[in-house]
Amino acid sequence: MSQKLPPLKIYTSQLPLVSHKNMLENEEEASHSQLFTPCPVPPSFPKASKPNSNQPYPNGPVCIYPPNIYLYAKPTMPIIQSFDVVINVAKEVLHPFRTDGRHYRDSKHNLDIQVFDHIEYVHIHWDHDTQFALELDKLVSFVAYNAMQLNKKVLINCQMGISRSACLMIAFIMKTLNLNVSDAYEYVKERSPWIGPNMSLIFQLSEYQQIIRKNSSQGPYQSSSLKQSKRKSEGNLLFPEKPHSAQLPLVSPSTSESSMFTNLRRTRSSGSISNDAS
């Protein structure tokens, strides 16, 4: 004769509390992870473990001015070897090569250049307090000459790719596309949401804007590189047909504007920058 077991008592206080809202959120998160997978990274770039908001450029250099002008943080050797010209504007960042390479002086742009195999490496010793407004024009000209006339792939970097290198990239966009600081900042920010120069650097860009206007009083600026590219490609100024070497993937993650830039007011007419906050 079978023995009857006592009824099993379950105390609800011992069970984890799972609300209907949490169940829906978990289901939504699971379905989201199935639908969206990270884009593959080319073998020339080290894969980031988990991209997060504190890690800029998780997928490698970002193309700011197609097809061959890129912005990045401190590059590794495999990344450097993917470019023809590297411009490092961080004083504290040293090149990763084992030797000092071959040196020569670029008299056209007044720059000292190191050459490693096919790579031209320019080290500009800026820190976050450097007054660089007067240096920007020769660097912008150097970038335009190599990328747009010689059709080389150019990387601009600093330690984090946020401040100093971003300033040089913004300066290039200002002069090349004839934009004021606000619009050039927005152009770069849309392509690299991690940038965020401090106000001291922004004011130096504003000073550079006045230099551009002073030097181009006879109308909108066009560099000699742009003019030659125009003659060669019959009006296709911005996008040469064949890059010098293989293209990197375009990465344009979307994010909200930084709190610093929301305080900047567009001034298309005057070109100056002002703070909304008192």
UniProtKB/Swiss-Prot annotation:
Pfam families: DSPc (PF00782). CDD domains: DSP_fungal_SDP1-like. GO terms for cellular component: cytoplasm; cytosol; nucleus. Dual specificity phosphatase that dephosphorylates MAP kinase pmk1 on a Tyr. Has a role in chloride ion homeostasis by inactivating this pmk1 MAP kinase pathway. Residues 252-278 have a biased composition (Polar residues). Keywords: Cell cycle, Hydrolase, Protein phosphatase. SMART domains: DSPc (SM00195). Belongs to the protein-tyrosine phosphatase family. Non-receptor class dual specificity subfamily. One of its GO terms (biological process) is signal transduction. It catalyses: O-phospho-L-tyrosyl-[protein] + H2O = L-tyrosyl-[protein] + phosphate. Its EC number is 3.1.3.48. This is Tyrosine-protein phosphatase pmp1. The active site is at C158. The keyword NAD does not apply. InterPro entries: Dual-sp_phosphatase_cat-dom, Prot-tyrosine_phosphatase-like, Tyr_Pase_dom, TYR_PHOSPHATASE_DUAL_dom. Residues 217-278 are annotated as: Disordered. GO terms for molecular function: MAP kinase tyrosine phosphatase activity; MAP kinase tyrosine/serine/threonine phosphatase activity; protein tyrosine/threonine phosphatase activity. Residues 60-214 form the Tyrosine-protein phosphatase domain. It comes from Schizosaccharomyces pombe (strain 972 / ATCC 24843).
